[in-house]
Regions:
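Short beta-strand "wing" residues that participate in macromolecule-binding interfaces
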Residues: 70
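Amphipathic alpha-helical dimerization/coiled-coil segments
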Residues: 2-14, 31, 90-109
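Accessory beta->alpha helical hairpin/"wing" motif in late/C-terminal subdomains of nucleic-acid enzymes
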Residues: 85-89
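Alpha-helical DNA-recognition elements
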Residues: 61
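Glycine-centered, phosphate/nucleic-acid-interacting loop/turn motifs that mediate DNA/RNA or nucleotide
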Residues: 66
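N-terminal helix-turn-helix DNA-binding core of bacterial DNA-binding proteins
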Residues: 12-54, 75-84
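Residues within the DNA-recognition helix of helix-turn-helix
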Residues: 58
Length: 109
């Protein structure tokens, strides 16, 4: 019975997981940005293997949540889009990682 309370608590934590982060394409984007200081759009598209349109759509959602900062500019005469994980985005990834880690550890017990 006592173990049931522990399981219910863990399930509740999973039920409250950030769905914006949990979506596979956005999770890939966030993982790449977590490991680099800044990435350009082309690098991120290649790293995630998402189409430009799909990547752009997911980035818009992450930007609206203030998880990602999008900076548009030029490299010489060519347009360039630079992407950074915000402090809030980094915190969201950390929270997601910790929640998933705990849930997976509890499976082993």
């Amino acid at each position: 019975m006592e173990g049931d309370m522990h399981i219910n608590s863990d399930l509740r934590n999973l039920a409250e997981i950030d769905r914006l982060v949990h979506e596979p394409a956005r999770l890939m984007i966030l993982m790449v940005l977590y490991t680099v200081e800044v990435a350009d759009f082309t690098f991120l598209a290649n790293a995630t293997e998402l189409t430009d349109g799909n990547l752009s759509s997911h980035l818009s959602k992450l930007e609206a949540a203030e998880y990602v900062e999008i900076e548009k500019g030029y490299a010489g005469k060519k347009p360039q889009t630079l992407l950074r994980l915000t402090t809030l985005g980094r915190q969201a990834v950390d929270t997601y990682r910790d929640t998933m880690r705990q849930a997976l550890q509890d499976l082993e017990e």
